[in-house]
Amino acid sequence: MDLLFLGTSAGVPTKARNVSATAVIEASGSHWYLVDCGEGTQHRLLHTPLSIRDLRAIFITHVHGDHCFGLPGLLASAGMSGRTQPLEVILPAVLHDWVRQGLVASDTFLPFELRLLPVEELIAWRSETLQVTTVQLSHRVPSVGFVFTEINPEPRLDIQRLDAEGITRGPLWGELAKGLTVTYDGQLLNGNDYLRPSRPPRRVIVCGDNDKPELLAAVARGADVLVHEATFTQAVVERTGGTFGHSTAAEVARFAEAAGVRNLVLTHFSARYQNDPRRSPHIDNVRDEALAHYSGQLTLAQDLQRYHLGRNGLLEASA
């Protein structure tokens, strides 16, 4: 799987960072999923190879505008791009009427079926290759994280089962390897029943706003990637007197270290953190605070940067 960050700023955009949006890209590269859709997300997409036509589903973590205000515009552009495939949007129930009324009031016609599903009722969303579940987080409003788990990754034929059932080698095996249903000796065989994963499924967690990382304990242990907000550093919190429902880099890093997370990606940085090394506070303050508590692979997400989760288990920036 790959991650491509479309927005990494908290609350408001900056010249270098847009507000929250993260693309999760299937290992095959053919389809992708969007977590959160802050204002201007569709503009960011224009600077990537991602196509709205290949978007399988949208997941919104919570109701705050920096995570959802880009949704109506993105949907309208999807319609104007000629998309015809249904699109499922999993989002807080309170936003459903807002989306529908916005489209009606703006006389926006969608040539595809828009399916709005309440995130509060989501047990598991599935495609052919991924399962998505939720974990409840802690914020000023209800917020969730989305857990992406691969289904049967890089499937290969279960030769032992085929031999055990006496299914003769030949062209039929090739059909089964494609997951097709075939007839053998008068019986229907579903190819998916004869495929097994060639490696363990990978698990990637993309979180909404959260001030209690420990709520992720059950799903984060041994996770391949945890994407979590680090809105502040401890030094800033000590000056401002509160986190306003957000986490510091130190809090997230300590949790990730204890949970054994292989790759920690920090995002959703306060606009006060500068990229200019001559100004303070600097974004490196976030990195330094996290590194003091976390020994795994640490990444500070950058807008429009794509990251690849390789076979070695490391998440690394793509060229």
From Swiss-Prot:
Its EC number is 3.1.26.11. Pfam families: Lactamase_B_2. Its cofactor is Zn(2+). This is Ribonuclease Z. Binds 2 Zn(2+) ions. Homodimer. It comes from Pseudomonas putida (strain ATCC 47054 / DSM 6125 / CFBP 8728 / NCIMB 11950 / KT2440). One of its GO terms (molecular function) is 3'-tRNA processing endoribonuclease activity. PANTHER family: ZINC PHOSPHODIESTERASE ELAC PROTEIN 1. The gene is rnz. Zinc phosphodiesterase, which displays some tRNA 3'-processing endonuclease activity. Probably involved in tRNA maturation, by removing a 3'-trailer from precursor tRNA. Keywords: Endonuclease, Hydrolase, Metal-binding, Nuclease, tRNA processing, Zinc. Zn(2+) 1 binds at H62, H64, H139, D209. It catalyses: Endonucleolytic cleavage of RNA, removing extra 3' nucleotides from tRNA precursor, generating 3' termini of tRNAs. A 3'-hydroxy group is left at the tRNA terminus and a 5'-phosphoryl group is left at the trailer molecule. The active site is at D66 (proton acceptor). InterPro entries: Metallo-B-lactamas, RibonucZ/Hydroxyglut_hydro, RNase_Z/BN. Signal peptide: none annotated. Zn(2+) 2 binds at D66, H67, D209, H268. It is an enzyme of class 3 (hydrolase). Belongs to the RNase Z family.
